[in-house]
Curated annotation (Swiss-Prot):
One of its GO terms (molecular function) is structural constituent of ribosome. This is Large ribosomal subunit protein eL39. The keyword Ribosomal protein applies. The keyword Hydrolase does not apply. The gene is rpl39. Pfam families: Ribosomal_L39. Keywords: Ribonucleoprotein, Ribosomal protein.
């Protein structure tokens, strides 16, 4: 990744960084909840973004 990024790339990376987090614990406590964990987590070394 270049140190000089375009704003579009930077915005894309920021969105991916925000998506890559666990689900809050209070969501698991909701009644009838089936979500155990965030299945769309991405590890920086295992799966690349395809940039």
């Amino acid at each position: 990744m270049a140190s000089h990024k375009t704003f579009r790339i930077k915005r894309f990376l920021a969105k991916k960084q925000k998506q890559n987090r666990p689900i809050p614990q209070w969501i698991r406590m909701k009644t009838g909840n089936k979500i155990r964990y965030n299945s769309k987590r991405r590890h920086w070394r295992r799966t690349k973004l395809g940039l």
